[in-house]
């Protein structure tokens, strides 16, 4: 099942997509927030099989119940990978961070990101696992023998430009980064509504494209 980029789906189609993603979560033994509560967000990243570090070719999907408790699905174009300029010059001596696909429960909160301290989802509440790519080329290396765990600031944020950006370049050092500022702002609006209802704590699940087959 394919989703268009930066789209909102409601009604029967949203219910079908919800079932499709929740089945994938169930196969991985991950939790899904499917109770009858509005704005209880399922935030799911999908890493493209191409593993292209140069492009925003991954997907972030948010599945939740709206005001009328009907299911809504929103999707956004992102990268789940570090950009090529960071891969060439890692900021950590162990190598560049690449988030390991998993479900990370209650690990992010709304908080400041980066030098400009704008508001994003910040990894402040729990540890994550990352692959360490230390060969300083632009090919993504996801070696299970080189996994690091800790607080690495793997945030969910936008890139620095105000316009939609085509290439990642240095926009991601392992964070989950939106291609579109408009999409990011839409996503953060949902997060603020959810935080008012459930508290400032967010679960993020990163899947691989093959997990949905």
Locate predicted features.
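Cell wall/extracellular polymer interaction/catalysis modules
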Residues: 1-169, 183-192, 198-202, 209-211
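Residues immediately within or flanking Cys/His clusters that coordinate Zn2+
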Residues: 172
